[in-house]
Swiss-Prot record:
Motif (Nuclear localization signal): 736-739
GO terms under biological process: 7-methylguanosine mRNA capping; cap snatching; DNA-templated transcription; symbiont-mediated suppression of host gene expression; symbiont-mediated suppression of host mRNA transcription via inhibition of RNA polymerase II activity; viral RNA genome replication
UniProt-recorded Gene Ontology molecular function terms: RNA binding; RNA-directed RNA polymerase activity
Pfam families tied to this protein: Flu_PB2_1st, Flu_PB2_2nd, Flu_PB2_3rd, Flu_PB2_4th, Flu_PB2_5th, Flu_PB2_6th, Flu_PB2_7th
Protein name (database record): Polymerase basic protein 2
Subcellular location: Virion; Host nucleus
Site description Avian adaptation, residues in chain: 627
Role description: Plays an essential role in transcription initiation and cap-stealing mechanism, in which cellular capped pre-mRNAs are used to generate primers for viral transcription. Recognizes and binds the 7-methylguanosine-containing cap of the target pre-RNA which is subsequently cleaved after 10-13 nucleotides by the viral protein PA. Plays a role in the initiation of the viral genome replication and modulates the activity of the ribonucleoprotein (RNP) complex.
Organism, as annotated: Influenza A virus (strain A/Fowl plague virus/Rostock/8/1934 H7N1)
GO cellular component, one term: host cell nucleus
Similarity comment text for this entry: Belongs to the influenza viruses PB2 family.
């Protein structure tokens, strides 16, 4: 009431009315600016004058019970006067000091769990190694980098659902936790953060840091993985760099690195199979990286690398619209072109059909070690401004740009025939033929290109055909710059199509990616990559193929057994036996296959001759196209450990060893699994013994003593005769074979002879 009365008095004075009504609008705008809205317009000033007051802070009334009125020095901590317009207490900054020193403590157990990203960063920095500082020109280029080490790589939407479920489980709203990683994280975090006293909003912020990849477009010269980016301000300036080795790795960097290796291996393997696209999809769907399905990672991970993008395209995911050539990422920044097929003659008079791009275009080219700006017209390079770490890197970029320009002098510089092939032995397309040729022989290209005198332009110098710098002359149209070219910043993704040979096209039909662009660099993955697909067994060499093939048969034995007896042709054609063929000497494949298939056919024909161990052992050999021959084998050769090793048709060997007592199979000393033989197998009636390695001579002959059981039979020496009890209590005379090789004929004649002997 007091205030209102005061205002009325003021308004009654003519001066007040005049100020308020006649003040110009621009002043009014200023008044408005500082008085409207809740946002503080000059926080620094406000802080200064607030802190100059005795009691700048307001607090809940309960504070009067929790804090004494005066501290040990006798200074007043809070005032008895209420805060105007609320029922809060006015408090001195000294009260905060008192609270920090003497206030109640809470459990700190949750701090490392909630602030885990900070604690981990401190550890990485503690164990990191900072090296010397070097002063030199820094060629930095802006790249899209991950600034958040240690995240789980969920999408924002997925993370939002996890955070709501963990921090605000009782809030209303539909939450869909579908992916494996979402469910695991939710479970772990709920457990970790039980009874957490930290403000929920803070928990939510910190969880977001743990779950979501955050990227920024930053100038970088050097490592781009997130553990380097978090110390970017310490490791590179405008004219200096400091060497640094991170004191720990984070899973998201490891996932990115392992994903690239897995994708490269899969694309390389798919290229050589009969149906590359189908094979690639089969492998992507059956591969795990660090225990997570590769397809889940591909859906979430924004890594842009040629092989990764081919896998994404195959899965129908959008990818970046830039295209790849010669290991450089090209992005058209202006101009346009139309395609036209044209035939050109090389220096060796070989005809090449190339797709010529007609029209003026400008591109940025970004590679790992060099970047460039390229301006070109129809079959003509107008200008190339390139920057790179060293001569070699610059040369790589120059070769790629020269080939890409499709200039005649480049095509005429070809010496010799172009017949490069890919992994599947198919000829490369003409542009890649040219690229491969000049990557091997750039000298002729550079010498044929021509040179020109140059003007003195700041920050640019010339480069001669031998790749040395010069201020007077340069390769025609080519200049070297101190400044790098930024990577394309947009994160825009476009719909693409892919054909069965893994060529990826944009919507206008231009090929933007193909297996030829996939790097041949081999690396060692940081996380375990588990390729369940048989196509990837070869990746770890012949031994792995051998072990994996037998493990696969044992794992699927129930189905294999039925197919073996009912639809053997289907079984022999299974793709799981494909890798095995590369271990069998080429000349012997068909003969082995014919031999094993015949043996199997007899096992099917003659009751009681089924032998689990032998079928498993010989099955992979039956997959090759069979040759009909009368060849007999007592052992089959496989090429492992750098030489031929033998698998015995009957009995154990270092390659294939079945232990009857433990019922386990070891292949090359590695456990391949447990075998369940059919009940009664091995004692199933004497035929199984008779038919392999014994010749039936006729009816029982008393001179050779009482009838032996099947187990006693195995003690016979070669050439020895004995009476044997078979099948339904009949006795026949047999002789143990002198040679191992005639196993096959045994089983053919045995059936007839048993019948004759019995009848």
């Amino acid at each position: 009431m007091e205030r209102i009365k005061e205002l009325r008095d003021l308004m009654s004075q003519s001066r007040t009315r005049e100020i308020l009504t006649k003040t110009t609008v621009d002043h009014m705008a200023i008044i408005k600016k500082y008085t409207s809205g809740r946002q503080e317009k000059n926080p620094a000033l406000r802080m200064k004058w607030m802190m100059a007051m005795k009691y700048p802070i307001t607090a809940d009334k309960r504070i009067m019970e929790m804090i004494p009125e005066k501290n040990e020095q006798g200074q007043t901590l809070w005032s008895k006067t209420n805060d105007a317009g609320s029922d809060r207490v006015m408090v001195s900054p000294l009260a905060v000091t008192w609270w920090n020193r003497n206030g109640p403590t809470t459990s700190t157990v949750h701090y490392p769990k909630v602030y885990t990203t900070y604690f981990e960063k401190v550890e990485r920095l503690k164990h990191g190694t900072f090296g010397p500082v070097h002063f030199r020109n820094q060629v930095k280029i802006r790249r899209r980098v991950d600034i958040n080490p240690g995240h789980a790589n969920l999408s924002a939407k997925e993370a939002q659902d996890v955070i709501m479920e963990v921090v605000f489980p009782n809030e209303v709203g539909a939450r869909i936790l579908t992916s494996e990683s979402q469910l695991t994280i939710t479970r772990e975090k709920k457990e970790e953060l039980q009874d957490c006293k930290i403000a929920p909003l803070m928990e939510a912020y910190m969880l977001e840091r743990e779950l979501v990849r955050k990227t920024r477009f930053l100038p970088v010269a050097g490592g781009t993985s997130s553990v380097y980016i978090e110390v970017l301000h310490l490791t590179q300036g405008t004219c200096w760099e400091q060497m640094y080795t991170p004191g720990g790795e984070v899973r998201n960097d490891d996932v990115d690195q392992s994903l690239i290796i897995a994708a490269r291996n899969i694309v390389r393997r798919a290229t050589v199979s009969a149906d590359p696209l189908a094979s690639l999809l089969e492998m992507c769907h059956s591969t795990q990286i660090g225990g997570i399905k590769m397809v889940d990672i591909l859906r979430q991970n924004p890594t842009e690398e040629q092989a990764v993008d081919i896998c994404k395209a195959a899965m129908g995911l959008r990818i970046s619209s830039s295209f790849s050539f010669g290991g450089f990422t090209f992005k058209r920044t202006s101009g346009s072109s139309v395609n036209r097929k044209e035939e050109v003659l090389t220096g060796n008079l070989q005809t090449l059909k190339i797709r010529v791009h007609e029209g003026y275009e400008e591109f940025t080219m970004v590679g790992r070690r060099a970047t460039a700006i390229l301006r070109k017209a129809t079959r003509r390079l107008i200008q190339l401004i390139v920057s790179g770490r060293d001569e070699q890197s610059i040369a790589e970029a120059v070769i790629v740009a020269m080939v890409f320009s499709q200039e005649d002098c480049m095509i005429k510089a070809v010496r010799g025939d172009l017949n490069f092939v890919n992994r599947a032995n198919q000829r490369l397309n003409p542009m890649h033929q040219l690229l491969r040729h000049f990557q091997k022989d750039a000298k002729t290209l550079f010498q044929n290109w021509g040179i020109e005198p140059i003007d003195n332009v700041m920050g640019m110098i010339g480069i001669l055909p031998d790749m040395t710098p010069s201020t007077e002359m340069s390769l025609r149209g080519v200049r070297v710059s101190k400044m790098g070219v930024d990577e394309y910043s947009s994160t825009e993704r476009v719909v693409v199509s892919i054909d069965r040979f893994l060529r990826v096209r944009d919507q206008r039909g231009n090929v933007i990616l193909s297996p030829e662009e996939v790097s041949e660099t081999q690396g060692t993955e940081k996380l375990t990559i588990t390729y369940s697909s048989s196509m990837m067994w070869e990746i770890n060499g012949p031994e792995s193929v051998l072990v994996n093939t037998y493990q696969w048969i044992i794992r699927n034995w129930e189905t294999v057994k039925i197919q073996w007896s009912q639809v053997p042709a289907t079984l022999y054609n299974k793709m799981e036996f494909e890798p095995f063929q590369s271990l069998v000497p080429k000349a012997a494949r068909g003969q082995y296959s014919g031999f094993v298939r015949t043996l199997f056919q007899q096992m099917r024909d003659v009751l009681g001759t089924f032998d689990t161990v032998q079928i498993i052992k010989l099955l992979p050999f039956a997959a090759a196209p069979p040759e009909q021959s009368r060849m007999q084998f007592s052992s089959l050769t496989v090429n492992v450990r750098g030489s031929g090793m033998r698998i015995l048709v009957r009995g154990n060997s270092p390659v294939f060893n079945y232990n009857k007592a433990t019922k386990r199979l070891t292949v090359l000393g590695k456990d391949a699994g447990a075998l369940t033989e059919d009940p009664g197998e091995g004692t199933a009636g004497v035929e199984s013994a008779v038919l392999r390695g014994f010749l039936i001579l006729g009816k029982e002959d008393k001179r050779y003593g009482p009838a032996l059981s099947i187990n006693e039979l195995s003690n016979l020496a070669k050439g020895e005769k004995a009476n044997v009890l078979i099948g339904q209590g009949d006795v026949v005379l047999v002789m143990k074979r002198k040679r191992d090789s005639s196993i096959l004929t045994d089983s053919q004649t045995a059936t007839k002879r048993i019948r004759m002997a019995i009848n």
